[in-house]
Amino acid sequence: MTTIGAQGFTLRTRFAELGITETFRRVAEIGYRSIEISALAMTPDNVAEIAAASTEHGVAVNATSAPLTAEDGHSLTQDAVGVAEAAVKLGSPFVRIGMFPPAAYENADTIRAAARQANAAAPVLAERGVTLCFHNHAIEFARVGGDRVLDIILDAAPLVQLELDVHWIHRGGLDPVRTLRHYGDRVALVHLKDYRLALPNAEAYEALRAGDPGPVREALFGVQFAEVGEGTLDMEAIVRTAVEIGAPHAFVEQDATYGVDEFDALALSYRHLVDLGFTDLLRH
């Protein structure tokens, strides 16, 4: 069964302000029983506290995050064993790459080189029961020499699975439901992130009256990240498709909440998912 949990990037400032244990408590209080760890340093102390908080509050860690390379050395190219062992300590069956380093996107050859590095790390994780995934943004749907960047990555990294982010799929010009079905059993994880168009707020119009048109123009031509059910995406169809293709885990993510408390945003997404009939996926 597919589970629906919370994505830690949404709570990155809360982890910093409140600490790991209290943040987990608040996530559990909303009703989530699953989380993906992101934007949180995987130091030994943090891993130990995450494990304890997961047990105490009944929120399973179903995915963690690791970069391809990192200055602190905790990366897939520098310490794949350490990345895998941290995931194992947390009971996490998946590790995901949020994005390749910017230099990797220079051309098809650099994209393939980064993908091959990820592919080389995948068996190290697999030996320890952990699956490596790659998370998309919109840029992975750009074409290089006629091929989509995402397809170049997948061809060069056959041992790496996908974490498909439906907001970025839509922003990249594709239909999320069709894209989920297209990649099918290559999809292990899904990010449930809605897509919102919003009129300029009062502050933007105050700036306009003061002679600064920038905020109004930005809003008129911009896109927002939205709570599930508060945007334009067909989230019911998206979740049903994730279940249909057998994706084990989905996570509610909102990169920015525009002044709304992050826990309130996650709670609103939770309520909408309940209203759509997905209580079992949230409580599993």
Model-derived features: positions:
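A short, acidic, amphipathic alpha-helical segment used as a generic capping/interface helix at domain edges
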Residues: E230-V243
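Acidic/histidine-rich catalytic cores of soluble enzymes
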Residues: L125-V228, T232
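Conserved beta-strand positions in the central sheet of alpha/beta enzyme cores
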Residues: E36, A63-S65, R96, C133, ...
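Short, flexible loop/turn segments with low-complexity composition
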Residues: A202-E203, E253-Q254, L281-H284
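C-terminal/domain-terminus segments
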Residues: A247-G277
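Acidic-and-aromatic substrate-binding clefts and catalytic sites of carbohydrate-active enzymes
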Residues: R12-L18, S34-V47, P67-Q78, P102-E106, ...
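N-terminal pre-domain/capping segments
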Residues: M1-P93, Q161, R271-H284
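Active-site acidic/histidine proton-transfer and metal-coordination neighborhood
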Residues: R25, A53, H57, D72-L162, ...
